């Protein structure tokens, strides 16, 4: 019995590990490679007829005057893939609302590199095909796009060990890339336009905009309008990918507001005190109100898109029958080499060189920690076109035509070349230029110094937790109650250190006030007191708090603007920059920056893992 139980437990653990891996970007990329190989093997096996017959199977419905019939291949490309492009639109809206595109310098750099990363590959393709005097110029759109998910997954496999900042840069870049690529699909590769369905589609977009203006927080009205938009777009003759992108752009996104979180907490307290169906529904609605409908839809669609929709698309589009001399024919075709050169060389030079020149000219700035080698490595990986490329090939040539099959071979070969080139550039950058990471620093610098740092708990405690705080930050541990949970769990086993990272309007003066209180031995009472009064942090409020706590007010006022206190706060600011802390709260467990969630349960689990010596988060050596 024990052996059997152990076997079942081991199998369960293996399944859980596989499921966890598939949820990562690298896992999704590996799944896509596997599905692509399956499609190629199936299309070249004795069962190849079944493969092609499956995707040409007619599927449709009649509902009163509405009639929609397409083969299965079109249902995938014009139906399922709309969700993929809708997801891209959601991400673009998030980046503009509270992401990296709010930074004008980064947005300008992404726009410049994104545009040239679309234009140059297209020019390379046209040049090669035109010089060869070959047909196939209409397929230039196959080289303009980047498969964001595939590219980021490949980056996780072949890129630097820590590449968070490079990932942000590439994601910002592909936002522009994807927007332009989808616009090209909608404008260049659409069929004959029908006016009435087009007007209905435009009215649907206006409806989405109006819903956003009214701050509608429920997802259902948006989803219903998007469904109408899709139907109208399919009937209009415009490719549905453009509708998906446009719809995603119109779904409102905004940063989570503190008052929404507080309201949800009160609703949960009501449920805790009097559990009922009504109070449970109120909690559910309260939680939904606290997060933008954009982020909720994105979270709901992200995994199904990565693990189901895109793999199905790959299965439907990557199956090329290379028997009968197709490979020899493809490698002798200007279309194949136009696709390869456009995606591999065009993306590398269009993104890499343009980024370098733009930075040198002061037109933009790279994220901290990202070097030139990392930029070119990421530019090389941007040559993984796959999803957008295969979609445009189907629209331009048809997947079963000779030109379509040759272009598809070019896309698949370019994926291999782009991956190998990116891997090589990352290796050279690490060995020659020391670019072993492309991320913010991960190690606390300088280490905790009991003579300088503010420490709560025994100085020789087994565990150390450092938090960078801003007294106006609504999510720091003392503001949310996380610290109380941590102290209750670890007691004297935990040494807690606070450093300043003021970035809110009242943050600097509040930080100086805490140091003025520290000069009178009252740092921790001050911190506990002021974090409950974040709504009132003007100078006169802080002086009033000093009086309430029994401090020497005259000395407090003198210290508030003293050079020594200012220098003490600036020391912590310099430490934050050197340690990769750029927002509050930022936690360091045993001198290593914590990434991801920072709720009390997560921080407790990481501290316990450190105590057991099983923490796996990577840190540069």
Swiss-Prot record:
Stretch list, region Na(+)/H(+) antiporter NhaA: 1-430
Keywords, alphabetical: Antiport, Cell inner membrane, Cell membrane, Ion transport, Membrane, Sodium, Sodium transport, Transmembrane, Transmembrane helix, Transport
Stretches assigned to the Thioredoxin domain: 431-578
PROSITE patterns according to UniProt: THIOREDOXIN_2 (PS51352)
Main location: membrane
Localization, UniProt: Cell inner membrane
TM ranges: 27-47, 72-92, 109-129, 139-159, 168-188, 192-212, 223-243, 300-320, 339-359, 375-395, 409-429
Keyword RNA-binding: no
Molecular-function annotations in GO: sodium:proton antiporter activity
GO cellular component terms listed in the entry, alphabetical order: plasma membrane
Catalysed reaction, written as an equation: Na(+)(in) + 2 H(+)(out) = Na(+)(out) + 2 H(+)(in)
Membrane topology note: Multi-pass membrane protein
Gene3D superfamilies: Glutaredoxin, Na+/H+ antiporter like domain
Annotated protein name in UniProt: Na(+)/H(+) antiporter NhaA
Lineage, broadest ranks: Bacteria, Pseudomonadati, Pseudomonadota, Betaproteobacteria, Burkholderiales
């Amino acid at each position: 019995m024990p052996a059997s139980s152990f076997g079942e437990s081991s199998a369960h653990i293996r399944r859980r590990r596989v499921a966890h891996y598939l949820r990562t970007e690298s896992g999704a990329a590996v799944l896509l490679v596997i599905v692509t190989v399956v499609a190629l093997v199936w299309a070249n096996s004795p069962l190849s007829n079944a493969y092609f017959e499956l995707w040409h199977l007619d599927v449709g419905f009649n509902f009163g005057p509405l009639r929609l019939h397409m083969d299965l291949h079109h249902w995938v490309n014009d139906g399922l893939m709309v969700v993929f492009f809708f997801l891209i639109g959601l991400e673009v809206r998030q980046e503009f609302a509270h992401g990296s595109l709010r930074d004008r310098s980064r947005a300008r750099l992404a726009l410049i590199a994104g545009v040239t990363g679309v234009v140059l590959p297209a020019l390379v393709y046209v040049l090669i095909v035109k010089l060869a005097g070959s047909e196939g110029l209409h397929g230039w759109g196959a080289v303009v796009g980047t498969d964001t998910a595939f590219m980021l997954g490949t980056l996780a496999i072949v890129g630097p060990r820590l590449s968070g900042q490079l990932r942000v840069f590439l994601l910002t870049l592909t936002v522009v890339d994807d927007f332009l690529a989808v616009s090209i699909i909608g404008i260049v590769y659409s069929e004959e336009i029908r006016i009435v369905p087009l007007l209905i589609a435009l009215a649907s977009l206006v409806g989405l905009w109006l819903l956003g203006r009214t701050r509608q927080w429920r997802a259902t009205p948006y989803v219903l309008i998007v469904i109408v938009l899709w139907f109208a777009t399919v009937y209009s003759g415009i490719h549905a990918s453009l509708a998906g992108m446009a719809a995603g752009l119109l779904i409102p996104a905004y940063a989570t507001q503190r008052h929404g979180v507080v309201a949800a907490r009160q609703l949960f307290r009501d449920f805790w005190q009097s559990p009922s169906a009504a109070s449970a529904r109120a909690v559910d609605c309260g939680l939904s109100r606290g997060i933008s409908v954009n982020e909720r839809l994105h979270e709901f669609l992200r995994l199904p898109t990565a693990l189901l929709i895109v793999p199905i698309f790959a299965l439907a589009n990557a199956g090329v029958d290379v028997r009968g001399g197709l490979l020899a024919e493809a490698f002798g075709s200007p279309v194949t080499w136009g696709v390869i050169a456009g995606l591999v060389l065009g993306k590398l030079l269009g993104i890499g060189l343009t980024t370098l020149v733009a930075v040198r000219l002061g037109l933009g700035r790279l994220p901290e920690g990202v070097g030139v080698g990392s930029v070119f490595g990421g530019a090389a990986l941007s040559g993984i076109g796959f999803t957008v490329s295969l979609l445009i090939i189907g629209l331009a040539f048809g997947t079963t035509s000779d030109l379509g099959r040759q272009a598809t071979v070019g896309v698949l070969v370019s994926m291999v070349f782009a991956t190998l080139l990116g891997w090589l550039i990352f290796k050279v950058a690490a060995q020659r230029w020391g670019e072993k990471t492309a991320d913010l620093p991960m190690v606390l610098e300088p280490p905790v110094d009991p003579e300088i740092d503010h420490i709560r708990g025994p100085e020789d405690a087994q565990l150390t937790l450092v938090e960078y705080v801003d007294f106006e930050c609504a999510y720091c541990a003392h503001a949310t109650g996380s610290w109380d949970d941590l102290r209750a769990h670890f007691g004297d086993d935990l040494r807690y250190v606070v450093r300043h990272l003021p970035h809110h309007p009242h943050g600097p003066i509040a930080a100086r006030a805490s140091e003025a209180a520290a000069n009178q031995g009252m740092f921790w009472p001050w911190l506990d007191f002021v974090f409950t009064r974040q709504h009132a942090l003007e100078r006169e409020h802080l002086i009033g708090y000093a009086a309430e706590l029994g401090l020497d007010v005259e000395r407090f006022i003198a210290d508030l603007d003293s050079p020594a206190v200012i220098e003490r706060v600036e020391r912590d600011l310099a430490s934050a920059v050197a340690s990769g802390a750029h927002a509050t709260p930022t936690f360091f467990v045993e001198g290593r920056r914590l990434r991801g969630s920072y709720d009390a349960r997560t921080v407790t689990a990481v501290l316990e893992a450190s105590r057991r010596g099983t923490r796996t988060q990577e840190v540069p050596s």
